[in-house]
Amino acid sequence: MPLFDGKTLTGWEQHSGTAEYRVQDGAVVGKTVAGTGNSFLCTAKKYSDFILELDFKVDPSMNSGIQFRSNYYTQETEVEIAGKKKKFPADRVHGYQFEIDPSPRAYTGGVYDEGRRGWLFDLKNNEVARKAFKQGEWNNARIECRGSSIKTFLNGVAAADLTDELTKEGVIALQVHGIGKKTEAVGKEVMWKNIRIQELK
């Protein structure tokens, strides 16, 4: 089932930051702006068990990601995560992220816990997946969530494979990473298209 109609952002809503999102040539385009933290274009609906696939293209100087089973609170909320108390500002998106990392580190396809625990599965021991990323081209992302099992694939190559119990449901979201004080990074773009999901019973 398509999550994006290729023409409008119907069914999506922006949270956390003020990066610019628009539709162009059948793709969602996210553009960096100054003075904001990470921004997320989120589905209005939450998903639990699913197979998500999409194509993405990213400026080589950027960092981005695809959130899944992610959430946010309407007001400041304190919760306990891994035995530690953590305070979330209102509207701060947090949760699992399929990393998009065009840097030489090449962790695209790894799973990062945005706003919570950090890296859950990096790619330092998966050289095949690190080499699967195509710089400056469209890449295919696939995310499979079944219960506590999370698997990711980059251009058909197995990337991350982990078991995690923390969150079983949440939104899908497209991240434009904040750029801090890097004025030279203003106006950089990341694109996503052919966004589709198969919900699993």
Placement of each model-derived feature along the sequence:
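Carbohydrate-interacting regions of secretory-pathway proteins
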Residues: 1-201
